[in-house]
Amino acid sequence: MKMVGRAWKFGDDISTDHITPGRYYHLRSNMPELAKHVMEDADPDFMKKFRPGDFIVAGKNFGMGSSREHAPLALKIAGVSAVIAKSFARIFYRNAINVGLPVLIADTDSIDSGDELEVDLGKGLVVNRTKGIEIRVKPIPEVMLKILHEGGLVSYVKKHGDIKI
């Protein structure tokens, strides 16, 4: 699975409240509306700059805070191709895989906002086309790659009946 888009960079400790601000929680049953507000508390102009297919890039502990699955789902519905970070909160990481949002662990120091990236999930590689460098990502376990390729856990189970680990 290859994806190309621009990077939008954030720092460490981006919480689920930064991703989906609590004041919009009443929209949780209307995910397309909630998705219009992703990252608003981290960057009020994010959705004005972002285009579907772009990537979110961050430092350590992305997705910390509450365990609500609305955060990764809203990112996916907004059109985020993948989140690339130095590390993720464990619950966010699993929720992202379960909703079909690729999450990649990599050194993000050489990526800046606006850089054009090419991500190859199968090869575990991020190419920063703007800077002409390759960044290896921590391999995604095979079962998780299969879930991502099906669009999430529910789609995977509907198609295959169960998960063989």
From Swiss-Prot:
InterPro entries: Aconitase/3IPM_dehydase_swvl (IPR015928), AconitaseA/IPMdHydase_ssu_swvl (IPR000573), IPMI_Swivel (IPR033940), LeuD (IPR050075), LeuD_type2/HacB/DmdB (IPR011827). One of its GO terms (biological process) is L-leucine biosynthetic process. Its EC number is 4.2.1.33. Pathway: Amino-acid biosynthesis; L-leucine biosynthesis; L-leucine from 3-methyl-2-oxobutanoate: step 2/4. The keyword Amino-acid biosynthesis applies. It catalyses: (2R,3S)-3-isopropylmalate = (2S)-2-isopropylmalate. Keywords: Amino-acid biosynthesis, Branched-chain amino acid biosynthesis, Leucine biosynthesis, Lyase. CDD domains: IPMI_Swivel. Belongs to the LeuD family. LeuD type 2 subfamily. Catalyzes the isomerization between 2-isopropylmalate and 3-isopropylmalate, via the formation of 2-isopropylmaleate. PANTHER family: 3-ISOPROPYLMALATE DEHYDRATASE SMALL SUBUNIT 1, 3-ISOPROPYLMALATE DEHYDRATASE SMALL SUBUNIT 2-RELATED-RELATED. Heterodimer of LeuC and LeuD. This is 3-isopropylmalate dehydratase small subunit 2. It comes from Archaeoglobus fulgidus (strain ATCC 49558 / DSM 4304 / JCM 9628 / NBRC 100126 / VC-16).
